[in-house]
Amino acid sequence: MGGLDKVPVKGIAAVVGAVLLLILAFTTPFSSASDTQAATEEPEVTQVGDGAAIPTARTAVTTPPAEHPAVSIPAPAAGAKPTQTVVISVDGGCETDKGTIRSFLDVGKQVQGRFTFFMSGLCLLPDAQRMQYRPPGHLPGQSDIGFATAELVDARVRVFADMWNEGHEVGTHFLGHFCGSGGVAGWSTQEWRDEITQARQFLDNWAANNPQVTDQSLTLPFDSSVIKGDRTPCLEGDRPAMWAAFAAEGFRYEASDPGVLQWPRKVAQNKLWQFPLPALKLSGTNLWVLSMDYNLLVNQTNGETDVAPGECARVEQQTYQTYMDALEGVYNGNRAPLFLGSHLNSWVCDSYIKALQRFIVDAKTKYPDIMFVSNNDLADWLDGMDPATLKGLQQLPEQKY
């Protein structure tokens, strides 16, 4: 397995702690870069933080980014319900040795959908270069998730290129994934900005950090300027401090808050769209759970990731039905965007991946007029909407079902 295709035990413990706090709040509804260096030339060598010698970077990202395929969400017509949007975001978004991300992109093609991938920036920084990372409040090279397996970087770059070329969005899930005590919850505005700066550098300088990738034609069709939004580790962070950092970094939305099935609003002081994870009714129960796979995990298996095959089938079906019920609720109700979060992790026999993929295909079959869009697509639509129309939608009550 690659370094980031599983959340480590320590990470799950921190996640579960954060999830339990959140659960308590929801007991009721509510132009391509070219190679400038000939293959026969010897690359210049430089030293990095840990003393390792790596080739000086060739240009391996496209600046400005290659043109992104456009999407057009119809403007709401007078007297008609707006288009139902479904926004699926993936925390991590780094390809594994199982080809999980590529498979998910293939599902997106079936429904002409676009997703958001919140990239964990360390998935392109190999372990041999870990000392380049200077995490706020922690020792150099420290992280609560793994660094990249060097052998997987080539595949990850190719999949990231496919993501962009197929219209998907690349956001950030930051780097070290520090949750709980001593983690991101206590970071200042400047510490958040330091983390973002490093995340940008590791993306833009991926080739310099990975001399084992010998294909000189391999290039990302985008650079870090495309990052316009985020989700924080474990949904943590001091809101005023991080919002100030994100606005200063040119973000246009934030996706770390819990919420309800209601039309999004902007934070008044910094104009960031708030795209929350809503509470969904867990099928067959009276529980309302955040629409993220690990929140479902805690409620369905008490956080256990390895269960009996029969339990796997139960979890998959319950998760699938939870998503379908929520979509039916908003589609027949206030038409608020439906936000669903995932890690595309292998927990519980891949139950959450299977349920989400089934949902995407079946939802589009049942409701052909729905659109699967990215967070950035949604922000474009909302920003371009008639202000009076948008205000009216925002004043609709939360959807219950």
Outline where the language-model segments fall.
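C-terminal domain-boundary segment and adjacent tail
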Residues: 71-73, 253-265, 324-401
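Short, well-ordered amphipathic alpha-helices
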Residues: 196-214, 360
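Active-site cleft segment of glycoside hydrolase catalytic domains centered on the general acid/base Glu
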Residues: 178-199, 203
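Active-site beta->alpha N-cap acidic-glycine motif
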Residues: 58-169, 176-180, 202, 211-237, ...
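N-terminal pre-catalytic segment of deacetylase/amide-hydrolase enzymes
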Residues: 2-88, 96-103, 373-376
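Well-ordered, non-membrane alpha-helical segments in soluble/globular domains
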Residues: 98-102, 146-157, 192-197, 316-325, ...
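Active-site-adjacent pocket scaffolds in enzyme catalytic domains
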Residues: 134-137, 146-150, 216-331, 386, ...
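Conserved, mostly hydrophobic/aromatic
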Residues: 108, 173, 199, 246, ...
